[in-house]
C-alpha cells in the first residue's frame, strides 16, 4: 500500500494555476490524502503564467490523465502526448483558450510496484532516501541548459534573470513538447519518499531545507505545510503544490 498526501494553494497570487492529482482524484486548492494500492499515477501540473487560462490547462490536463487505466504495458509517452493534443485542439476550438499550456511532472507506479517517472517543463520530482534528497527529474528550462553548459552554477539557477524561461510544454501550439520518461525497474524502499512539486516550492526552498523538513517527526501533511509556509516566508510569488508518496506494508 501507498500513502499519498498532497497540498496546493494559490500562495501570494489571486488565483491558483496549479493542480495536483493522486490516482483518480485531482484538486486545485486544499489538501488531498489517499491510502491506495498500486497501480496508480500521481502528478503536479503548473499552468503557464502569461498564456491563456493556465488554470484550465492544468486542471484539464490532470482530468485527462486521471482517466488513464495504468499498468506496466501502458505507453505513458503516447498517453501524455494524447493529453497535449487535446489541450491544443481545445484551444483551437475555443479562441479564448488558444495556446493554454501547462507543465506536468509525476510518477506512475505499476501493479508490480515498479516506478516510472515523467516530466514536461520545470516542475520537479525528488526521491528522499536515507536522509538524502535526490532530484529525479530534469528541468526543461533555459537555466538548466546554461548550467549543463557550465555557464552558471547550480546556486545561480534559482536567482538567474531568465529562470522562468522553459521549453515547450503541454498545449503549446507552435512546438511539440519533449516528454521525458524514465523507468527505474525498482520498487520503493521502506522510508523512501517521492516528492513532486511545482516551482513555487523548488525556486525558493533548497534541497537541504526540504531534507531537514522531511526528517522531522511530524505528520506528512504538517511537513508539506511547513515547506509551503517556508516558501512564502522566503518570498515565493507563485502558486505552491506538493505531493509526497511513501510505501508501507499493510499485511
Please report, for each region that a protein language model flagged, where it lies by residue.
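PP2C/PPM-type serine/threonine phosphatase catalytic domain
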Residues: 1-251
